[in-house]
Structure formats: C-alpha cells, structure tokens
Amino acid sequence: MQSQVEIKHIESDTDLEASFSVMKELRPHLSDRATYGAQVARQRTQGYRLLAAWSDGAIVGLAGYRLQDNLIYGRFVYVDDLVVTASLHRSGLGERLLQAARQQAVALRCKHFVLDTGLHMALAQRFYFRQGLLAKGMHFVEPLTQEATT
C-alpha cells in the first residue's frame, strides 16, 4: 500500500471537495462540503495548507498544518489535522503524512514542530510518542458565547 500512495498539497476546489469524507472521520461535526470548504478557505488566509495522501485516485489521508511564530517556540509548524481513513489505520500512512508535514517545517526553517491531541486519545498519544514528539504542556479551552463576551 505505501508504495502506491502519493502525498501532495491540495490546491484545487475539486480536490478539497474530495477530501471532505476523510476529514469528516476526524472532525465529525463538519456538516457538509460547502461549510468545510468555506472553513478551509478562511484558514488558508492564515497560512493553512492541506497535504493529501492519494491512492488509486482517492484521498485516503490528510495532514493540515500552518506556519506560526510565537514567543514560546519561535517559528514553527503547527499540525491542526492528521487523519487516515479507518480502513488504513496501522498501515504506516499516518507516519508518512506526519513526516511530510515535518519536512515542510524543515523547509520553512522552523525551530519546532507542534500539535495537540485530546487527553482521551491514548492511541494517538502513543503514535505521537513513537514519532518522536514529546508532551510539553496542556491545552486549555473555554467555549465563548456572545453573552460571555459582552
């Protein structure tokens, strides 16, 4: 399987639309292709890029990332999304996608390669440790409503 997979950036709207079903496996709250496309378009204005793994003309995995800069890490690539279609879990494809994103970070002369995963996702955490990533902190989130911001 691995030798038949090509990893390349999604550049066209047609390819973005074709990626929806795979992204929905990771982000089940995504309601439809149009909403997904609009969200990716907004994220692209902030530097978001989407790598796709193609096999036999179909997208079977995705890695979404963006270049960032902050006082903690300096210049770094942040991985927003990493997903491999369920039928290809444990095939090595996740490792290949993560490596492709890491290579982008190196090419962009980044000092760090960063991602988050849910505390409830033990298998993902084990995968990231095996890929050489280390847990360096916790990510805190507060959902905001309009009432809370006024």
What do the predicted segments below correspond to?
Residues 95, 119-138, 142:
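Conserved active-site alpha-helix within GNAT-family acetyltransferase domains
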